[in-house]
Structures are given as C-alpha cells and as structure tokens.
C-alpha cells in the first residue's frame, strides 16, 4: 500500500517540486539554501499547498458524472457540455477540475453534478473553505476576511464574494430553521447540576438603511413645513432582538447559555418562538426545573412573559434597571450632586437587593419623600419623583431580590444584555456601518458561535449542499438508473 501511494505521488508535478525544494535546501549553494528560515517556511508552505491542491483536484474529479442524462431531486437533466474546466476555491488554494454539465430537457440553467455531489457551496467554495470564511465573517468584515486569507498565503475569495456567502448560508438556515433547531436540541443534554432555567429578552438599536431613508424623508418633510425640531428617538436605527436561555446550578453558576439574535421584526415573533421552543425542550427533559423570566422594564418584553407559557415562572426585573428609577428619585429630591442623596441611594439600593420585602421599604421611603415635597417651587421635582415612584409600584411584583437570591435565581439580566453587545453591537455597529438584509446573516452566525452550536449547525448546513445524483443509462428502449458513485 505504501509503495502504491509513493508511486502515485511521484507522478505529481507538485510532489516533484516539493522534493526539489527540500533537496535545494540541503545544498550549500543556491538561492533556497541561502534563504532565511522565514523565507524557507513560506517557500515550503507554497510547495506543500501545491501538492495538497493537486491531490484535492484529483479526488474532486472523481465526483464528476459522465452520463447521457442524470436525475436530481426527481428532475431529469441531459448532458450538454463535456470536460469544462472550472476553478473551485479550497482551504489550500484554487482547484481547477474539468467537469460535465447538464441542462433540463426544455432548456434553462445548467447544473454541475460534480459540484452537487461534492457539496460545493455557492458554486465555488469547497465545504471546508466555506466554513472557515463564514466563521471569520462572523467576527470581521468581508474585506478583513479577504485580507486575512491573503495574509495566510492563500488565494481566497474576494471581498464581494465573501460578502455573499453568509447571506446564502443564512437563507438556507432560515428555510430549515425550525426542524434543524429541533434536531439540534434533541442531541443536547441538560446538565444534572442544573436547578434553574432562566429566559431573558432584550433588544439593541442598530443602524438601518431603510430607517435612515425614512428618517431623511421625515426631516425633509419637516423642513418644508418649517419645523425645527426632529422626532424623538434615534433616527435611522431599528431594534435587533436578543434572547437567551440559561441553565444555572444551585450556586447560581452558569452551566450553559443559548443565545438568539433576530433582525428587526414586528413583536419579535421569530425570536420569541425560538425562546418558547428552547424552554419547552428543556422542560420536557427536566420538568422540575425552576423557571425565571428576566427583562428590563420595557412593556413589550413583559407582554411576552405574561403569556400562559410563563404562568409558573418567577418574573424578575433586572436589578440594575430597577435601580435606575431609584437613582432618578434621589436626584429629584436631593439634587444631582448631593452627597446625602448619593448616600441614601446606596442605602436603599442595598435594602432593595438584600432585605426581604426590601421593595416595599423602598416604595414607602419614596412615598415619604414625595409627601415632604410641597409648595410651587418643588412642583417639577415632585412630579419627577412621583413618576419614579409609580415605576416602582408597577414593577413591585418583580422585585423580590432577596427572595431570588435565596432560591438561587438570577436577579439581573446581564446575560442577555451582554448578548446584545456581543451578538449585535460588536459586529453591526462598527464605525460607518449601516445594514440592509445582511443583519440576520451575521446574527445567525454569531448566535451559533457564541452558543457553542457552530459545529453542529455546520454539519446540517454542509449536508444540505451535498446532493445525490442518479445516472441514467439507456439500453435500447430500457433505462438503467443508478446512484452515482466516485470514480476509481
């Protein structure tokens, strides 16, 4: 077997070049012998990649199908072109392989059986390179990805081609999302140490081209009517939804977190459906887990958590967000720079966090301060304080922080707030960025990466592009149909 392999390699031009490089390095004279180690490393790498490319090209050619006709997904295709050279991009460099093309009987676009059987993605990427480029695109721009590939000494995809790949993969994932996510969940294990499952929902504003056009039209209309003020809120931005499902042990240590990110959509329908499905899958295995529902004070988030699915869940307002109206109330009563106000804020915050029934004590303290503010000179400040008091009263049932700590429940939505930053902000809000339909592609890739589900997800994506081809061979009036196999 080793002799056969050596014989095969010796017939390759790239193998001969590799041997020449090694032989030249051992001679005292010559350019290669005088190279620095760095230069030799580059030269050797190119030679090895050349050998790798030639071996890959030979193996890829085995997936070609030379038949009068083929059947793919139930449709018949007839051979139209033979031995057409085409270059695919691999993780080691370009592979140029001659292949056959087939066309529908009634005309139309050709298919390449070789590409279908090998799982070539986007007509040009080998599966390994497609995975590598998509992974990098989750962390950097297409231009940066192209430059990194070049820096590695490879002839990789252009910036424009790299930009198209995540969109293609995202579209495929979206069309199979529910069954694929379901299949992935069935393979996952709920840790035996888990005692709490926490579901969190939030959002972050990102620059959006459609919103920017709308904002520009609004500004121009206002200008024509002589208005000088703009509408409130960040113009040219739309909200990306983020959600997390976290498993914690009895010490509130995080065991596992699944992160989801969705492009702007009405009432976050897809995102909430993903959270529902993830929670249901976990509770189907461990129905005794305590469920926590965490969010900030946004009404939209709590409309989601008030549904019957979360009837038995403990609703928790993030402690940090609960502290914000408390800080504002102290500023309204004592003044922004008051040392006494800062001290009282610190006291009440600790009371809210650690004292059983602390929320009631804080509400009582705020009500007492509101009563003490009287007179016309305090009207505006009293109104501000009463507003914050009302916020506290409205969220009272979700602010038993001492009880949550005792039961091992999280009291903050820091996990989902971090997801907003790592899923969306770090990739979608870089300087000068503005997005159209490419947002979801980045969010899908990053959510899979950050949830440690990338490898499992890629296995599903890669398999989607590998398509079986049936060869059709005629014998008189008879036809023989056989599943195409690799050539010897």
Predicted segments with their positions:
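Catalytic center-proximal scaffold of phosphoryl-transfer enzymes
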Residues: 1-58, 99-488
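An N-terminal low-complexity regulatory-tail signal and nearby short nucleic-acid-interaction modules
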Residues: 58-122
